[in-house]
Amino acid sequence: MGMSFSHLLIVLLIIFVLFGAGKLPQVMSDLAKGLKAFKNGMQDDGSDNDKNK
């Protein structure tokens, strides 16, 4: 019950319409930075637990 290619295209089209061509690169950049910070935070949290053992 995953997303098919047509569903993915529809979602991308909606995002493009909502944010427009001008803002889309900035939105994607901010999203990537947020995901990277989240991933780093999860790794830091895991290493803190290892130190406490």
Curated annotation (Swiss-Prot):
Keywords: Cell inner membrane, Cell membrane, Membrane, Protein transport, Translocation, Transmembrane, Transmembrane helix, Transport. It is a single-pass membrane protein. Belongs to the TatA/E family. This is Sec-independent protein translocase protein TatA. It is found in: Cell inner membrane. GO terms for molecular function: protein transmembrane transporter activity. It comes from Rickettsia akari (strain Hartford). PANTHER family: SEC-INDEPENDENT PROTEIN TRANSLOCASE PROTEIN TATA. HAMAP family: TatA_E. It comes from the Bacteria. GO terms for biological process: protein transport by the Tat complex. Part of the twin-arginine translocation (Tat) system that transports large folded proteins containing a characteristic twin-arginine motif in their signal peptide across membranes. TatA could form the protein-conducting channel of the Tat system. The chain crosses the membrane at residues 1-21. The Tat system comprises two distinct complexes: a TatABC complex, containing multiple copies of TatA, TatB and TatC subunits, and a separate TatA complex, containing only TatA subunits. Substrates initially bind to the TatABC complex, which probably triggers association of the separate TatA complex to form the active translocon. One of its GO terms (cellular component) is TAT protein transport complex.
